[in-house]
Amino acid sequence: MRQTWVAACVAIVCLIGCRPAEVDHSQQPSATGPAATGPAATEKKAEALEQNAAAAGNKAPPSPSEMINKPEAQAVDPAGAEPLDDAITCLARTIYWEARGEATVDMEAIANVVMNRLGHEGFPNTICDVVRQGHEQGSCQFSWWCDGRSDQAKEDESYATAKEIARKALNLQLTDRTGGALYFHQRRATPGWAAEYAKTVQIGEFLFYKPRGGEAR
């Protein structure tokens, strides 16, 4: 009897103490690896948003997970000196150099023109190419790209505003204040081409236009 009782006790102890340790899966790395973070990941997001915005007739905003948030946008090109090779940087620098020192609504209107051109017939399908268009002939659509000066942003606050506007534009969260304009000039300028286009609106120091027949030239 005593031997039977001892054997039973040993069996119970083994059942309790010999169980394999449970794995805490919450501490294990994901099978797909950690989520990508940092400016490079944000630039990839921006590329996808750019393609979405360039799609003809696509006005539907992306899902929240696809959108760029404020910290992500500000982490890209923090010193305003990175190469112009991604959508956020190209758009933000254009906003900055075309309208720095002007009101926020003026800066937003410049972003509107870039986004209106994106994917429009007669214009490229990426923001950087939209901004650079014409530089091969020395006649850039956006003058800052061809002026021969440094492209580095020098005013932190103004450039931070430009990046925030670029973020909203890529997220399709920016109201088009220009009435679909594809062209603009400063109010004090009198370019010869202006008479060929229909003026849509004046915003601050800028006048905005679009083709009378709807086609870009």
Where are the model-predicted features located?
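Enrichment for repetitive, rod-forming helical segments
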Residues: 9-10, 26, 51-52, 124
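Bacterial extracytoplasmic/cell-wall-associated proteins, especially those involved in peptidoglycan
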Residues: 22, 54, 59, 64-217
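Sec-dependent N-terminal signal peptides
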Residues: 1-23
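N-terminal propeptides/low-complexity segments immediately following signal peptides
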Residues: 24-45
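Long Lys/Arg-rich low-complexity intrinsically disordered regions in nucleic-acid-associated proteins
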Residues: 43-54
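A general, composition-driven signal for non-globular sequence regions
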Residues: 13, 38-39, 94
